[in-house]
Amino acid sequence: MTRFGMTLLCALSVLIVSAEASDLAIEPGQWKVTSTTLMNGAVTPSGVKARCLSPGQAADVAKTFGPVSGTVNSTCEPAESEIAGRVLKWHLLCKGQLDIDVLASFNFDSPSHYTATVSSKGRMAGQLISDVKTEIEGERVGECQQ
């Protein structure tokens, strides 16, 4: 994930997405998450991170992969989310000193693999200051490492 993306996520307070995810569950365990980001037209190096998902996190995909909201000096609308089959989509819109518009689509094509696209645009005083698109692939690689 890019520095802007990390800053964006860290600057936001938690919002739990309201969505029924009874059909949408993935396997708990150790996941390898690879991300490639296009930031303001420039490709950044791919990143690979390990992520351990507990049984609770794996069972509540909407919460685990849902948006975060509540920027400083901006107000976020309640996130819009939708689950259709094995696809989770959400949209987060925040307005204020920094306007942020984030769209995400996660395709959980199996209980041990997913792909996602997260796109965000940041504007200050109406001027586009950040245009970020991140492609993500997650694959379960085994049990969580202690």
Would you name each region that the model predicts?
Residues 38-44, 95-100, 123-130:
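Short, cysteine-centered beta-strand-loop-beta hairpins and adjacent loop/turn segments enriched
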Residues 34-67, 71:
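Short, solvent-exposed loop/hinge segments that bridge or flank secondary-structure elements
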Residues 45-47, 98-104, 117-118, 130-134:
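Short, surface-exposed coil-to-beta transition loops
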Residues 64-105:
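Mid-chain, structured segments of secreted extracytoplasmic proteins
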Residues 5-16:
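Bacterial N-terminal signal peptides
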Residues 33-36, 89-95, 117-122:
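Short beta-strand segments that buttress and anchor functional surface loops
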Residues 122-146:
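Edge beta-strand at a domain terminus
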Residues 20-30:
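N-terminal helix-cap/turn-to-beta initiation motif at the start of protein domains
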